[in-house]
Amino acid sequence: MKTCVWITVAFVLLLAAPATRADGQDEPYKFFRESVGLNEDQIGTIRSGKALAKVVESTTPDEVFVFGAVYVKASPEKYLELASNIDALRKLPGYIDIQSFSDLPQLSDLDGFALEHQDIEELKTCKVGHCEVQLPAEAIEEVKQSLDWSAPDLDYRVNQLARRMALQALLDYMHGGNTALGVYRDKSHPAAVADTFSSVITRLSALPVYLPELNEYLLEYPKAKSDNVQAGFYWEKVNFGLKPTFRIVQRVVYRGASPADPAYAVAEKQLYASHYFETALDLTVCVQDAQRPGFYIITVKGSKQAGLTGLKGSIVRKVAVDKARSSLERVLLSIKQRLESEPLQGN
């Protein structure tokens, strides 16, 4: 199996050799075959319009990379529009709730958000070094000191505090970028979110070569600026098959500057997750089919997760990656069905 580094290099190389060129007539099939390691039956599955996902080899057990692809008889612009449509995303498999933040985020943007009762129970015994809910150390102290744990309306109070803390964390990121994302100290090895994100994006080693604006934006926000980027924030409550998880995400939609050689990409950068993910980045590119109208949605989901090492962790990892693979297939198929529900006007 190819390593995740080579997978993502070849993945982004597709953007440098669009299928509209003569030398790109075999793309993305050559990429599927030589880089992802798909056999002809698997490639045929994708060409026939079915979604396919595959777990990609990673360098360490706590890193998880999943590749997925599906052919869609629609235009890439329709996908970019869908990726920015919160109402449409809410209907995709796995979503419990999802809401956009205002351009200037405010507390009311988090109306409707509530922690699971199990999470609230686990917060009662949460302490630095051991906490079932993923929180930076300073947030753990604030939770412990700010609440009357015997109050009859405890769930309400916890959720009000959680909303205020989530809003402040987002505002801090909008001002200070990755360094404001904090450090998780509820593990034996403290994890700085900025460092773990850098380690994941490093695997996308061709990204700074072929999409330098997008790469810089992901690493250097808010200092980085680009006319080719549309960005926004949302929160989501999702079920990955284990515990329901609350996440704050920055969505970055990228359109290449050259009309003759367009590049379409969507990056979803996790800023916070209540469970599992220390950091995560989903990168999707749209590659037009050389032989027929339509395009391929090709996604690589990369994350760094706690609790996946050791004997117990290896068992958890097997379950987690299998659920991630099957979930990606379901989501890609749902996206395809939605995009193809309107007639294709031409690419």
What are these regions (language model features)?
Residues 6-16:
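Bacterial N-terminal signal peptides
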Residues 1-5:
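Positively charged n-region of N-terminal signal peptides that target proteins for export
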Residues 23-72, 76-78, 88-89, 93-347:
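Terminal "cap-and-tail" regions of soluble proteins that handle hydrophobic small molecules
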Residues 18-20:
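Intrinsic disorder/low-complexity segments in short proteins, especially the signal peptide
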Residues 81-82:
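Generic alpha-helical secondary-structure signal
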